[in-house]
Amino acid sequence: MGSKIVQVFLMLALFATSALAQAPAPTPTATPPPATPPPVATPPPVATPPPAATPAPATPPPAATPAPATTPPSVAPSPADVPTASPPAPEGPTVSPSSAPGPSDASPAPSAAFSNKAFFAGTAFAAIMYAAVLA
């Protein structure tokens, strides 16, 4: 029972240091910009007289354009006149469901490297130290 309590304590310590390491930094306070003096009123610019008007050049009237010729509306083909196409045949070899490879019976043995309690404790301790350095 004692080793389980130590493991729980280490995990809680890891979570606490991780939470402290990821806490947001305090936001910097914004300093107001220095006050600027109000703009000085400038006198309005002196109005200049408009330039003398020049007479517009005379343009000839546009020539009359002939009206476009109308064409009779075309007749749409009936559905009976449209040929129907057959769907394309599939290309390449066909694979039947029975020839699909099944799951292999021989599965690799699980690794025993991560089941060692000393490895778990060492990893937790290293993580705690890493989080403490970052905090």
From Swiss-Prot:
O-glycosylated on hydroxyprolines; noncontiguous hydroxylproline residues are glycosylated with arabinogalactan. Residues 112-135 form a propeptide. Residues 22-112 are annotated as: Disordered. Glycans are attached at residues 24, 26, 28, 32-34, 37-39. It is found in: Cell membrane. Residues 96-112 have a biased composition (Low complexity). The modification 4-hydroxyproline is found at residues 24, 26, 28, 32-34, 37-39. It is a lipid-anchor; GPI-anchor. This is Classical arabinogalactan protein 4. The lineage of its organism: Eukaryota, Viridiplantae, Streptophyta, Embryophyta, Tracheophyta.
